[in-house]
């Protein structure tokens, strides 16, 4: 039996402040080692959404500065209903670094400005001088009814991760 993983990489051209595109490369390599085919589509500003959310296994979004996250957040608002339905129907979103903030109810940047949010995750974020950084090891065995998934182990440095609300 062969497996396929459909990934949508969102805004990696501008949300890649700490080399977050490496997360996608790592996932793809791990899939290759396991004989899992990866189908990748990319989406960014001023691009047509040329994919169906029902066909997506994983959405990946990297991190950026407050300024770029504000720009992306405004663009993401166009996809709010689709993204909320995706999450509510057990879709998986890997938000790296500060990109999780855009999915919350409130996000105040370092200047205290309220950035428009998708209001999908029940979180409020206020930027502060001191940040939490360090290594995290996550083991996750997602038991989707339609697929059998492997243990996914990800080493992350300097990033917050939220996979599901």
Question: For each predicted feature, which ranges?
Answer:
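Fold-independent oxyanion-binding glycine-rich loops
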Residues: 10-12, 43-45, 62-64, 96-99, ...
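Conserved beta-strand scaffold positions in the cores of enzyme catalytic domains, especially
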Residues: 40-42, 120, 149
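Generic structural hydrophobic/aromatic packing signal, biased to beta-strands
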Residues: 27, 40, 59-61, 103, ...
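Cysteine-nucleophile active-site neighborhood
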Residues: 66-142
């Amino acid at each position: 039996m062969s497996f396929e993983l459909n990934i949508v990489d969102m805004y990696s051209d501008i949300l890649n402040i700490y080399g977050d595109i490496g997360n996608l490369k790592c996932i793809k390599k791990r899939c290759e080692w396991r004989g899992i085919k990866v189908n990748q589509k990319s989406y960014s500003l001023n691009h047509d959404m040329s994919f169906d959310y029902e066909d997506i296994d994983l959405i990946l979004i990297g991190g950026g500065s407050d300024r770029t996250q504000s720009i992306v957040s405004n663009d993401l608002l166009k996809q709010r209903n689709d993204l909320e339905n995706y999450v509510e129907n057990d879709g998986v979103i890997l938000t790296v670094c500060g990109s999780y903030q855009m999915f919350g109810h409130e996000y105040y940047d370092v200047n205290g400005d309220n950035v428009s949010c998708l209001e999908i995750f029940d979180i409020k974020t206020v930027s502060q001088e001191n940040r939490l950084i360090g290594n995290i090891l996550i083991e996750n065995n997602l038991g989707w009814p339609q697929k059998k998934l492997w243990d996914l182990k990800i080493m992350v440095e300097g990033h917050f991760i939220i996979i599901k609300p």
